[in-house]
């Protein structure tokens, strides 16, 4: 097993250890979060946890949770979320995030913002000085508005591109039935303002900027060939 995979597993274990019995847990999307879901399921099976309920942020998270026999519910049936565990594509020094590489950022933002504690799990390669430095900013758009929205996104200084499917002809379609526009910036100096400007465009459902939402960042690192987990509060 390669070092990066081991590192992601270690981060997943640390995140899963934060879950307590009798709690509602937001289950995020992505390769590192998948290990957290696995270890939550293993803690349940071993009797270390009991009476927890998961709120999945995507179809992928739902399938994984069912695989590991984590009981699931929906936001209609719960009045709070104790902790949410989710990944990120970029993290800046202020703990602001870009998410949405898996095209699930709208549902993720709803669940993560509702959580009393939002724990982000990443590898050290996701840490950046400025958001938008390496990763495109995803924007979920209703299909009929795609052309005017792309024009307005370009007017904000970004280079928009409709995300196309892999191993599928045509564009990526989100779990909500919408399209994703990936927006390239040279760097984002004011993520809070940009988040609001994009969301104010008619036809935009949500974008992948998560500003002031994360409580704890768990960073997986390889030091002297060994995986380590560092916590950023």
Curated annotation (Swiss-Prot):
Reactions performed catalytically: aldehydo-D-ribose 5-phosphate = D-ribulose 5-phosphate
InterPro entries, per the entry: NagB/RpiA_transferase-like, Ribose5P_isomerase_typA_subgr, Ribose5P_isomerase_type_A
EC number: 5.3.1.6
GO cellular component: cytosol
Gene3D superfamilies per UniProt: 3.30.70.260, 3.40.50.1360
Protein keywords: Isomerase
Protein family per UniProt: Belongs to the ribose 5-phosphate isomerase family.
Assembly and interaction partners: Homodimer.
Protein name according to UniProt: Ribose-5-phosphate isomerase A
Source organism: Picosynechococcus sp. (strain ATCC 27264 / PCC 7002 / PR-6) (Agmenellum quadruplicatum)
Gene encoding the protein: rpiA
